Amino acid sequence: MYLRKTQRVRRWISPCGFAACLSFTLLLTSGLPVHSQQSAESTKAAGMDGMRGTQAMPAMPMKGVLGEMKGAFGNWPASREGSGTSWQTDSGPMFMKMLPSVGGFDLSAMGTLQAGYVNAGGKRGDKGFSSNSMLMLMGRKGLGGGILGLHFMTSLDPIFNGPRGVPNLFQNGFTVHGVDVGDRKDPHNIFAEVAASYSHPLSKNFSGFLYGGPVGEPALGGAMYLHRTSGLNIPEAPISHDWFDGSHISFGVATLGLVYQNKWKLEGSLFNSDEPGVKLYGVGRFRLNSSSGRLSYNPSHDWSFSTSYGYLNSDVNQHRLTFSAAYSRALTQGDTLSATAYFGQNIVQGSPKSNAWLAEATYYHAKEAFFARYERVDKSELIDVPPGNYTVNKFLFGDVHNFYSKDQLDYGLGAYAGLYSYPSALNDVYGNNPITFGVFLRIQPGKS
């Protein structure tokens, strides 16, 4: 992530913040499954088509049982679809709440709201309140033999955290009001996605889709960390975020994709790689100044692979290369294991290549979600340290316990800790062996 400026906002929770939080709660608690018998029959027929390997796209494929829902981009389970147009595994758990249909659109909501206390540790680590939130609304309906999709995503981070974001040791630096800020994660924008899509079968084996809008995610990297079933319960952003899924909020996206046999997907995007932070409460200027391409492959229900390349033509021209593998497995007694591994490389002219590795997993067992994440990242954008490219290792682990469930919502309490290793040249700045720890409350739709 490059140094940037964010607009002036008040750091205390304004009346607008309370209204947004209230709307978040009311929206998730008001939705009830509203589907006719005809819709259920359409879904059953769609499932039979999928078993035969056809590309038929039913007009109204959703029904009350989330496991039988189809995606917005093709005739596959909705669980496959991550952020933007990315793929995950089919067998991953769904955390979704059905809403009443409106105007022929089947509506659903996903998301997470996390709020708590964090002490980042060491000489450089801040401590205090921390919030991490993302709310997604999706609508889809049959149109002209294909599927029209509407995609909206918002975050309360700017309201709760302010422009300085939250403590996140070894996160890349950014600038607020002309002041460099390091070891903190900048907030997501209020408008994180405002986009539409249309998918249509082209033949027995091929289907195609279009996706785009004023705010969206290009075909670069994989599913954003709050959308991955392996990472959505982890309350801290990866310090490798800018090597893999850092372009997930772009003010201008247009993507064209081709799918073969519901297993292979090739797509290309034009998008805006300018940093979106200067418009925390609005939408920036629509531009298509960068490009990317991605190849995805789902050989089975449990596996998903992808590789992508992007040219980011912003303040600093950058090339990005990514590889990823995701795995999910439904276990006995309703347990699920979800894991993701990825490699990302950023190349800036005149600078050495920088690499990032990540491996994370979450084990869903009864009311628990045990999580762990390991990262190894080459860092050259740390603030107020001697110039250089430093390899930083981070291991984070914790658990969330669901203590209450009502109206398809789970309320959980979590705790976590983070450990680090890095070159001794940073000891004077970061101290020896800093430890991060935090506690948090999490609200999200229940697992289905």
Segments from the language model and where they lie:
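Outer-membrane beta-barrel "beta-signal"
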Residues: F397, G431-S448
